[in-house]
Amino acid sequence: MLSIGAMANIKHTLQKELFLASGERLLSVVTVVKKKDKKPCYLCVVTTAPPVPVVTLCLIKQSEQREGEYKRKRSWQLDEIKWVDGRNEQFETHEFDLQLEKLYKWYALNPHERQNFLAVLNRQIQKSVRGQRAEFRNVPAAWLSEKSPEKVALGRAVQKTQHMDDEEDEEEEAQEFTALTDKEANELGKLFSECDFAIKDAEQFIEQLSRELHDLDGANMQSVLASEQKVLKMMEHIDNAISEADKFENRLDSYEDILGHVKETMEKIGGKNAMIEIANNNNIKLMKELNKVISQLDLPHSQQQALDEPDLKTANGRKAAIAAAQCLQQAMNSDIDPALLRLEAVQDQRKRFEKWKQKFSATVSRFMNNLFIHLGNEIGDMQVTSTELTLPNHSNVHRELTPYTELMHWTKAMDRKTYDGLMRVYTASLSKIYDRDVRNFFNLAKIQVTEKLRNSREDLDMSTSSRKSAVSTIPYGTLGINRDQWGPGVETADRMRFDALLEKVLAELEPIALQEQLFCINFFQMDVISPTTKNTQTTLEMEKAVDMTQSIISGAVSPSGDGVPQKRIDRQINEDVRKLMMGLFGCLEPELVSFIQSFERVDSFYSLYVFVRLTQHVMSAQDTHSFLSMTFASALVQVKRSFDRFMQNQLLSIREAKLHKRSKAILPYVENFENFAQTAEGIFRKSDRRTDMEKWYLQLVNAIFEGIQLHSQEHPKTPVQVVRMENYHHMYALLAQLKVPGLDALKKEAKKCYNDALKAYVTQYFGRPLEKLNQFFEGVQLKVAQGVKETEISYQMAFSKQELRKVIAQYPAREVKKGLENLYKKVEKHLSEEENLLQVVWHAMQEEFIAQYNYLEERIQKCYAGAMINLEFNIQDILAFFSDIARSH
């Protein structure tokens, strides 16, 4: 490590030998090496002389030829430095990096030099660079903020030796180049023009400047002496002004005392006037409140009489009673200040209101209770003898009750207990009528559907058990079972009649249920979750009412304020309406489900019709929260389960299918799937539930494909390839006919499997009719593979021309045709007539035979060219053989 003395010596040497001659000054130097085993070099920060100093970074190296001689290798402007990396903020670190036109990595021999160099470099960059300045990384902040880190590094040891250099550094660093102003430049130019001789005689110029300076000093002294008298006179004027200001201030103080007394007097007068005005305002407000209370709590005598003895049977009596009840409701819910409620007169009046309310409410309750029971009994005694499939309309009941709607609204607002009791009486009275009508309606619907299937209604519930015991336990339409094992089925016309009647049943239910629901909402004011009035309680229960109101307010407001309370209110209203409708139509859903299930037991395909039809009504409902929509939706859930159960049974029947000894090549589930798919497409073609059916299509077809692969190996008589070929062909034709987009991939798979099975069957059963010829040329190919040329094969003893002619002589045209006839008979036995694939297979065998023939002819021409050797038949003969055999059968 270099000592401090050595550092100073290097700096002095470089300044003297390199920079002094060019007028430059060395600000800082650091001894560095690129690698530890190389010679050191010096990084220097150098500046030119004022007035416009230019600071540069130089790399100095020592000459190898001459000891003590230094050369400048590179120079960079400070704005070329992009960043400086100290590598580590520890003082003992020697490494640092400079990013110039490339990255330079240096190792400083002395950390003090490194510290001083980085500090000086940062200070000069901050002073000289006007644009983007270099970034200093991993350098202690103290180094960058100290004014003179070089002094701190060198210490007192070098103060004596470098005292003169430091003073020069400080003086030159403190110098700032300042340009002359225009005024200074003009005056300097004027001075030089007046003293033109100064260029020739500097001493004369200095003497003239001295004389002018002496004259200016004298003028300044005279000006100071002259201004002294003026200053004394000004001080005298200031003393006079101060005395006058004191007098004026004393006068203002006396005025302020007088105004203070006036202010206190006016404040007292203003306070008295304010109290008088407040008293007058209070009297006016009190009079208004009293008039308001009297007008709000006043009930005319005629209305009091109408409440005591109401006449609810006549229109005029009802009108008067309703008007009196509404006035009473308005008076009891009037907006009165809570303090006024404590007045004895107010409490007495509200007690009288409470008595009138209870008496009138009891009268209304008794009258409406009797009216509900009377209407229910009157309609219940009527005999229903209609044979048409219609649900009776009870709009006459609604017309009878409509005039009493406002009384029910008043009862809900003023006496909730009575209101709930009347609602229960109405539900009990009308529910008996609707139960009777709904049961009769569904019984009549069952009779109309089954009138051609059975002779009496008693057979309806026992139909399934009687059919199973008499004929079969296997439901009609089961895919995995042969048709001759199915139980009795239902004709398509019967299914269509059931679908039409189901639509009529659902259409009849909708207007009746909707009419009753709308009437109940209006009559019982069910679209309002709570009374619209503010208070129905007397002053005796005021404190309890206040607590209840606060709890309602706190519970009704959502913390997030996002409209949740309104949703909660709507949900509560819908719940109350459904509860009332459930009480009126309690048997509707069980009867509907029973009606559907009774026919599903007769024919499982009915579940498909119900699934589609019920979905249409649920999706087309305008009010999805209505009672009937919810009832249909609940029934639809059960129908969907029945539908899934039916499809699951079909899928299970395919997987568990068993073949009998006399089974045909077409598997039962493949044959049955055609009728099943056509029926399902007729039902689901334009339905919103088509996606559900397509999902089951995928499962069923995949199960059928798996079954074909499995059961083709178990077939007792027919070859595996034939079973697969015919069944895949049948499925491909059916899927192409259905044109279901979701089954396109399976249709392509069916076609591929069919072609693979056809190819495998032709390969296995057609084989090679010219077997010995094929074996002969297999030996030829073996010799060629061993290196014998094709043109020299005839010289081999085993493959000579004579041997070839002997083999060809074994296949005359007559024998070949006879072999093909036997093959045709075998194929005819294998294939079934339903699929009509005999000609397709026969044509494929013809193509295979022609391919083998062409191969043999090609081998003969290549290996025995010019020998005039040919088969006894040609391609035209082959075509004739196949055509004659096909026509003869």
From Swiss-Prot:
BP-aspect Gene Ontology terms: exocytosis; Golgi to plasma membrane transport; protein transport
GO molecular function per UniProt: phosphatidylinositol-4,5-bisphosphate binding
GO cellular component: exocyst; plasma membrane
SMART domains to which the protein is assigned, alphabetical: Sec3-PIP2_bind
UniProt entry keywords in alphabetical sequence: Coiled coil, Exocytosis, Phosphoprotein, Protein transport, Transport
Coiled coil: 156-269
Modified residues (Phosphoserine): 145, 148, 456
InterPro entries per the UniProt record, alphabetical: Sec3-PIP2_bind, Sec3_C, Sec3_CC
Subunit: The exocyst complex is composed of Sec3/Exoc1, Sec5/Exoc2, Sec6/Exoc3, Sec8/Exoc4, Sec10/Exoc5, Sec15/Exoc6, Exo70/Exoc7 and Exo84/Exoc8.
Family the UniProt entry places it in: Belongs to the SEC3 family.
Function: Component of the exocyst complex involved in the docking of exocytic vesicles with fusion sites on the plasma membrane.
Name assigned to this protein: Exocyst complex component 1
Protein source organism: Drosophila melanogaster (Fruit fly)
Designated gene of the protein: Sec3
